[in-house]
Amino acid sequence: MGSKFHAFLYPWFGFGHMIPYLHLANKLAEKGHRVTFLAPKKAQKQLEPLNLFPNSIHFENVTLPHVDGLPVGAETTADLPNSSKRVLADAMDLLREQIEVKIRSLKPDLIFFDFVDWIPQMAKELGIKSVSYQIISAAFIAMFFAPRAELGSPPPGFPSSKVALRGHDANIYSLFANTRKFLFDRVTTGLKNCDVIAIRTCAEIEGNLCDFIERQCQRKVLLTGPMFLDPQGKSGKPLEDRWNNWLNGFEPSSVVYCAFGTHFFFEIDQFQELCLGMELTGLPFLVAVMPPRGSSTIQEALPEGFEERIKGRGIVWGGWVEQPLILSHPSIGCFVNHCGFGSMWESLVSDCQIVFIPQLVDQVLTTRLLTEELEVSVKVKRDEITGWFSKESLRDTVKSVMDKNSEIGNLVRRNHKKLKETLVSPGLLSSYADKFVDELENHIHSKN
């Protein structure tokens, strides 16, 4: 229709949610729409540098009320221990009156939310549309509809028998379901009561799962694509000389790059197992991880004699690296990662072999999808009881995809190449955002 709308955004107050919501805001603003982003004042200061359209995206501050257990000055999950996340949810619930006042004053056409399940009812009362915008994978959302006693099997009607939880993976899911039940239930309620569901994914990867969610919730499911990534990594910025010069010393597709994001911390024993596993591959490697728990530096946590043994062919780095640029270097042949959202997409649009060691429940499910359903990656085997991986299992998994004569290595290489060609085809991912915005406009003007 081409008419412009005004959207309110009310994400969960964790930066892992607020930042993707701001990427959404940037895309809406790029298309000429107005956005009001609801956030605490301290969070706004950290988000503002990511606001690419300050004339179209306006922050409205909300003040969290005091609730028992919420520390003075705490505004986001970064201010709280894991055990106190429910307290933040309780405080966000008490913002209803503040938000209602802002809606009546600013008159948006729709409001995006993820965990606050009373938004659909309030939106209906105020005559605006509600959109449950989920940044977690469709595979994870779909499992919300599995009976708790049957986590080892997919829900009835589930489109894949392979994206299921078994062994230690099911234990991770059960732990999440029990300790985060308050979020679990909120998301499910929001999905079933909103006007529209939107998910940060694409049909080429999770199309069947999105169709399943649509049937379960009886709500239209819109896909945004990854929303913020340049799939071909063409930023124009060169790789830092330190890494470029080091990588230039190796043959094409010979180096194993390993990273787990800036928010994950290994236990020291598992960190050392990771290092030893990389050493055992016999391949050159670059590991970029945070220092393990209880260690202030990477060096103090390394196995005894490790640095001397791997000198010249391996680096373990404890700081930030330019991951997309490293992955685009011709010497990189394999990417070992946790299947976090950013790393997953960066691996899929790279030319590297992909090895996953998922850490969180949504990463576990996405790994199963990519490894067992699409067969574009492999997963490191773990102990069924502890969930830990051994240095030998890491070595064997990496070598299985780096060996040119390996059957599994050639299978995932072929499948990954086909999927990558689809994902980076001109205009594919940007077309998701365009279609998403067009469909939002239609829903705003529909009478249902």
From Swiss-Prot:
Q: What is the uppermost EC class here?
A: transferase
Q: Which CDD domains match?
A: GT1_Gtf-like (cd03784)
* Enzyme nomenclature, EC number: 2.4.1.-
Keyword flag Transferase? yes
- What residue ranges are annotated as transmembrane? none
Residues binding UDP-alpha-D-glucose? 262, 321-323, 338-346, 360-363
Identify a single GO molecular function assigned to this protein.
UDP-glucosyltransferase activity
Checking InterPro entries in the record gives: UDP-glycosyltransf_plant (IPR050481), UDP_glucos_trans (IPR002213)
Is Transferase among the key words of this record? yes
Keyword annotations: Glycosyltransferase, Transferase
Would you identify the family this protein belongs to, as annotated? Answer: Belongs to the UDP-glycosyltransferase family.
Write down what this protein is called. UDP-glycosyltransferase 79B4
